[in-house]
Amino acid sequence: MGAGPNGLAAAVTLAQAGRSVRVLEAQSTIGGGTRTAELTLPGFRHDICSAIHPGAAVSPFFGSLGLELDWIEPPVALAHPLDDGTAVLVRRSVEETAHTLGRDGDAYRKLIEPLVADWDELAPTLLGPVARLPRHPVALSRFGRSGLRSARGLASGRFKTEAGRALLAGASAHSFLPLEQRAGASFGLVLLLLAHVSGWPFPRGGSQAIADALAERLRSLGGAIETGHDVTSLRDLPPSDLVLCDVSPTALVTLAGDVLPTRYRRRLERWRYGPGIFKADYALDGPIPWRAAHVAEAGTVHLGGTFDEISDSERAAWEGRHAERPFVLLAQQSLFDETRAPDGKHTAWAYCHVPNGSTFDMRPRIEAQIERFAPGFRNRILECATRTTAEVESENANMVGGDISGGANTLAQLIARPALRRVPYSTPLPWLYICSASTPPGGGVHGMCGHLAAKAALRRR
């Protein structure tokens, strides 16, 4: 159930094993968090949810499929502009990145280089269940010494400049956690090391290309997909040996609560969701006029200024408040992909974190943050399409309250995702599995939740 990247990955894995597979999708189109559409004006193609895909680029499952995707890697993976007109630029080269950090260059190099060197040993753990016995405990312990710290603790202990601290803050804020939360630094470290491993690429034509490639592979293996098929109870499904659900824990309770054992059902009911997002997509009559010119070389831009400002923004969303100066995550794919907009025109994809379930219009605050680092941005806007948390959830039911991570990324929920079980994808019912981002390794487009769930199901059935 569910034709997002995890549902499709599960289906492909089952079909590769010779199983007869049918995917049921409630929406009229496939893709879940990897859909692309004309949201503003004709000819302007916007990613509805996910846009930049470092996880997809290193996914062992996607890599094994040899999907026909044209990956675009901008010269700069990530830019973090500052108020003085400069910007931190994260390039594929650790050395070139360190150079933009000035006095903190050596500290960055010492922090990141060993992790990049360890990536092949870290990947099996970081792209799978956290609670299982690690294959490479030495490499994992090296990562854990920094990753288990809070972002604030690691930043203050490692970096002397505002540039270094701000870079780590922005990367760690992808966790949706307060920057003082234990283990929050791990998210920032993984994203930064992936910038040097995979370069934070995206597929030409939009994220929809990933879902389309997976669907094509599934059909080539004999699998089928039905869109517009909303399932409200597992009792409505045709007879099946296995049912894999790319759904939230909340939805699984709705679908199967009457047949799930009480203890497991209550664990799912206690699952906590994190902050949501407010999203804005822009059709522009030209590129964003960044004050720091090199920001135009980046596919992704973090807009939040200093560590403390980003920290205030993330804590506000966590505590149910709306930040006056939100941390904004922005992608500018049309600078590198001519298929995204008509000739001479451009797109911008942006969101900020808000309280779960928020209905507040953050567009003016998002635009103020962009304008702060790119004076004249508002004059480039031709059209804007916004989405509140409710609209985000209506397009993808897994994003409960606008939470795009599949649940709050607390340390407890990283270990017990969504319940503490030897096989986290399994349920007490031997034929029923959950394979959404609420299972390991969590959010992002990599297909590993679905792939690993399907492998677990095949071992037991």
Where do the PLM segments sit?
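N-terminal glycine-rich phosphate/pyrophosphate-binding loop and immediately adjacent elements
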Residues: M1-E121, A408
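Hydrophobic anchor at the start of a short beta-strand
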Residues: R19-V21, V243, N379
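A conserved FAD-binding loop/helix module that cradles the flavin
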Residues: S50, C435-L458
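Rossmann-like flavin
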Residues: D83-R182
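Conserved FAD/dinucleotide-binding core of flavoprotein oxidoreductases
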Residues: E96-H99, T250-T254, A283, P342-Q369
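A glycine-rich dinucleotide-binding beta-alpha-beta segment and adjacent secondary-structure elements
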Residues: T161-P178, R325-L329, G376-P440
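Helical element adjacent to the flavin cofactor pocket in flavoenzyme catalytic cores
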Residues: L189-T232
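Mid-domain catalytic core of redox enzymes
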Residues: G223, T227-A341
